[in-house]
UniProtKB/Swiss-Prot annotation:
Entry EC no(s): 2.1.1.163, 2.1.1.201
Coiled coil: none
Organism of this sequence: Pseudoalteromonas translucida (strain TAC 125)
Task of the protein: Methyltransferase required for the conversion of demethylmenaquinol (DMKH2) to menaquinol (MKH2) and the conversion of 2-polyprenyl-6-methoxy-1,4-benzoquinol (DDMQH2) to 2-polyprenyl-3-methyl-6-methoxy-1,4-benzoquinol (DMQH2).
Protein name: Ubiquinone/menaquinone biosynthesis C-methyltransferase UbiE
Gene name in the database record: ubiE
Length: 251
């Protein structure tokens, strides 16, 4: 009897066993966690803060809301949401990577943000919450690292409350050819060098560049969100499409 072929997926440009991807992504983020915030500022020239500000402005978050900041890493979005939901609300910073959670927890504690934030290690494909739990779910620069994106989107849909929204902030496809070529040169030449100099890890930043190119484009992700059940799904290109902010609702 022949064995069932092993399912494969991509890890950057490499083809790997589906069951191996999560641990390989974990190794990347264990490696970069300590320098993650510094590298974000360097890589984006600080523009990531504007992208996140736009995400917060699109969130509709109010006092008393329950928010899941999925793949929340070092907690930039969680910090702001904690202030917006107030004492009667709750923010959960969720991440599959323990090193990223540790850095995020320490950073937010140092900012004095305690009381309405919980930290949970979780897999986006099987979120450990009851149905209809959250008013808002955000996933910023995390979806491209998920092995089964469709499964993760269905899991997010399940735990959103009716009327709740999902915001996906992610690298995407530049709108113009000239920008795309310049972005490719930067990503594949300068980014790994920066990673080597600052984080002593060029390979992780090579993976970062490759994972961005393998991520679904704007319209494909919009369709994936609709297929998962989301309605009124739209996206907004930021910085010429280098990043896109997708939004969908559950009714």
């Amino acid at each position: 009897m022949s064995e069932t072929p092993q399912k494969t997926t991509h890890f950057g440009y490499k083809t790997v066993a589906e069951n191996d991807k999560a641990s390989m992504v974990a190794d990347v983020f264990h490696s970069v966690a300590a320098k993650y915030d510094v590298m974000n500022d360097l890589m984006s020239f600080g523009v990531h803060r504007l992208w996140k500000r736009q995400t917060i402005a699109s969130s509709g978050v109010r006092k008393g809301h329950h928010v899941l900041d999925l793949a929340g890493g070092t907690g930039d979005l969680t910090a702001k949401f904690s202030q917006l939901v107030g004492e009667t609300g709750q923010v959960i910073l969720g991440d599959i990577n323990s090193s990223m959670l540790k850095v995020g927890r320490e950073k937010l504690h140092n900012l004095g943000l305690v009381g309405n934030i919980d930290y949970v290690q979780m897999n986006a494909e099987a979120l450990p919450f009851p149905d209809n739990s959250f008013d808002l779910i955000t996933i910023a620069f995390g979806l491209r690292n998920v092995t089964d994106k469709d499964k993760a989107l269905r899991s997010m849909y399940r735990i959103l409350k009716p009327g709740g929204r999902l915001l996906v902030l992610e690298f995407s496809k530049p709108e113009h050819e000239i920008l795309s070529k310049a972005y490719d040169f930067y990503s594949f030449n300068l980014l790994p060098t920066m990673g080597k100099l600052v984080a002593n890890d060029s390979e992780s930043y090579k993976y970062l560049a490759e994972s961005i190119r393998m991520h679904p484009d704007q319209d494909t992700l919009k369709s994936m969100m609709s297929d998962a059940g989301f309605e009124q799904t739209t996206y907004q290109n930021l910085t010429g499409g280098i990043v896109a902010l997708h939004r969908g609702f559950k009714y």
